[in-house]
A protein has these predicted regions:
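Cysteine-centered iron-sulfur cluster-binding motifs in ferredoxin-type domains/subunits
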Residues: 10-20, 115, 119, 148-163, ...
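A Rossmann-like FAD-binding core segment of flavoenzymes
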Residues: 193, 199-255, 320-406, 507-508
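Mid-to-C-terminal Rossmann-like scaffold of FAD/NAD(P)H-dependent oxidoreductases
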Residues: 2-6, 152-155, 334-373, 450, ...
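Rossmann-like dinucleotide/flavin-binding elements
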Residues: 49, 59-61, 104-109, 114-122, ...
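Beta1-alpha1 glycine-rich phosphate/pyrophosphate-binding loop at the start
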Residues: 2-63, 67-68, 72-103, 144, ...
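Flanking helices and flexible, charged tails adjoining ferredoxin-like Fe-S electron-transfer domains
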Residues: 2-6, 183-208, 212, 236, ...
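Ferredoxin-like iron-sulfur electron-transfer modules
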Residues: 133-149, 153-154, 183-194, 226-241, ...
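Iron-sulfur cluster-binding cysteine motifs and their immediate structural context
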Residues: 71-74, 163-177, 211-216, 225-231, ...
């Protein structure tokens, strides 16, 4: 069998690579490697000109494998794979060597070592490329319907957007009513619109839409399957129900921290949260006299290091509403996070209406004590550079949004991750900001992280668009990088099933393991743990990895 003809394309990436790696020397070295028929350098291999040069070289030199030495495959591999296919080379006969992130950027002060390392990485990539095999991507049918878990604003907007495109949607909401946390708001920032003016028309559209089915007082109990074919089990008002959908959207929202034990909350009825103040404002029951608000009550701490993002805006909005009722208002803050032009204007409006802002230091938080004639708030404020004592008739705590109580249970059911704070975590913050690593499942709203209504709705429309793509196509192609079980060697021990994080392996009628192609992500955990060596990882076979390892040990 003749060795495949390999082409190597080394990218200068402007100065990102060329300033630290001797690219011409690397190209000349690549030409000496076994199987390499052609090698060249490009200023930007990912540019239209660079891609056209790859296609021209494939045709002119009858190349059968392609290696690009440039930046990260995470961002650019799909682009180069498409280029290879356009020139008649199977996309799985392509290999990348990351000589930017893993070489030039690491060794900016060592150009000679950077050049030698670039040669090593290319030698390894060429060794693997020589053993690559074409891959076929299986297609699977997609059920053109969606499940939205959560009936808050983001869940309802996502459901409406999908339903308006002609797809059936089921909303599963655990509470008695749709609306989520917005039900507890009196008005919305930054335009002080009544929450009911937003919520009531939205709920009416959802409940009367012919394509949307709403199940309240319902929870998801089981999820099995893969993109295009998820089997859902729910408990709907005490009754079990099962149905099938093609995509899933997680929009379970978040909860507001109940800060018991913090600043006398739960001990003195004059201490309430911003959410509780909203309800008092709606009922017209705000105490007369002086109102003091404390920001970051329970957030930006060791236990919850994140900023909840909406707290400052909510506090400023409520401070304005309280000031308009003739109350004196103080806002005690660490850093006032009224981001964006509208919220900044809201802050300026609050100052014009007499709201006073005093900064406090994180290491010296306010001290609150109670007496029959009022609350006393003591702090050192760098704003006035002295200790301050305020008598308060009412103390308002700005508490953060926290993950819902059943987030962990749902994440395990869906096989999707949570971040260190307990919120649902996207596949990639820049490249796939609303997708999970598990295909066909998406996240939006405060289930993902604390955010305002505008951002939640933007994410909801984004996930609706993403979820609609496979449903509109009716079929999806899965990657050929997956595991394959040699059932003549499989002992049926089930170790691979136990370790697979995606539930992508099951036992067949003979009790032997088999891969579910649509679910497998090619992570390789099963292949690494199989005691019988019965599992092959396509595109990352033992032979290919060993060839790379041996190439790494060769002298450049």
């Amino acid at each position: 069998m003749m060795a495949p003809r390999i082409g190597v394309f080394v990218c200068r990436c402007g100065i990102n690579i060329a300033a630290y790696v001797d690219v011409p020397a690397v190209v000349e070295y690549a030409k000496t490697l076994p199987g390499v028929e052609y090698a060249e350098e490009n200023m930007y291999t990912c540019s239209s000109d660079g891609l056209n040069k790859i296609k021209e070289a494939i045709k002119k030199h009858s190349l059968e494998r392609v290696v690009v030495a440039s930046c990260t495959p995470r961002t650019h591999e799909p682009l180069f794979q498409v280029t290879c296919e356009e020139a008649g080379v199977n996309k799985y006969l392509f290999e990348m060597a990351n000589i930017r992130d893993q070489c030039s950027w690491v060794h900016m002060r060592e150009p000679e070592k950077a050049t030698e390392k670039a040669k090593d990485l290319i030698r390894m990539a060429v060794a693997k490329a020589a053993l690559l095999e074409p891959g076929d991507e299986p297609e699977i049918d997609v059920n053109p319907s969606a499940l939205v878990i959560g009936g808050g604003v983001s869940g309802m907007r996502a459901a409406l957007s999908i339903a308006d495109q002609g797809f059936d949607v089921t909303i599963v909401e655990k509470e008695h009513n749709l609306g989520g946390k917005l039900l507890g708001f009196d008005s919305l920032f930054p335009h002080k619109q009544k929450a009911s003016e937003v919520l009531e028309p939205l709920i009416k559209r959802v409940t009367t839409h012919p394509r949307i089915r709403v199940l309240t007082e319902s929870v998801v109990k089981s999820v099995y399957g893969f993109i295009g074919n998820f089997d859902i089990g729910i408990n709907a008002g005490g009754k079990a129900e099962n149905f099938n959908v093609g995509t899933i959207i997680v929009a379970v929202g978040a909860e507001v921290l109940e800060p018991r034990g913090l600043y006398l909350y739960g001990e003195d009825p004059r201490v309430v949260t911003q959410s509780e103040l909203e309800q008092l404002l709606h009922a017209g029951r705000v105490a007369a006299g002086r109102i003091v608000m404390i920001q970051c009550a329970g957030s930006r701490s060791v236990e919850r290091p994140y900023c909840s993002r909406i707290c400052c805006n909510e506090a400023v909005k409520n401070a304005i509403n309280v000031a308009e009722k003739g109350r004196e208002v103080y806002v005690l803050y660490r850093d006032l996070q009224t981001y964006g032009i509208h919220y900044s204007r809201l802050e300026q409006e609050a100052k014009r209406k007499g709201v006073k802002f005093l900064k406090y230091q994180a290491e010296k938080p306010p001290l609150v004590t109670a007496s029959p004639d009022g609350l006393k708030v003591s702090l050192y404020s760098p704003t006035v550079n002295e200790a301050v004592e305020l008598r308060a008739d009412m103390l308002i705590l700005s508490t953060p949004l926290i993950p819902v109580a059943d987030a962990k249970e749902l994440s395990q059911m869906l096989k999707v991750p949570l971040d260190s704070n307990g919120f649902f975590m996207e596949a990639h913050v820049k490249l796939r900001p609303i997708d999970f690593a598990t295909d066909g499942i998406f996240v939006c709203g405060t289930a993902h992280s604390p955010k305002g209504i505008g951002e939640s709705v933007a994410q909801a429309l984004g996930v609706a668009s993403r979820a609609s793509i496979p449903m509109a196509k009716k079929r999806v192609r899965t990657a050929a990088i997956m595991s394959q079980v040699d059932q003549t060697r499989c002992s049926g021990c089930g170790t691979c099933i136990d370790v697979c994080p995606y539930n992508a392996i099951r036992k067949n009628e003979k009790g032997l393991a088999e891969t579910i192609a649509a679910v497998c992500k090619g992570c390789g955990v099963c292949g690494a743990t199989c005691p019988e060596k019965a599992i092959t990882m396509h595109h990352f076979t033992d032979e290919q990895i060993q060839a790379q390892g041996l190439a790494a040990l060769e002298e450049g």
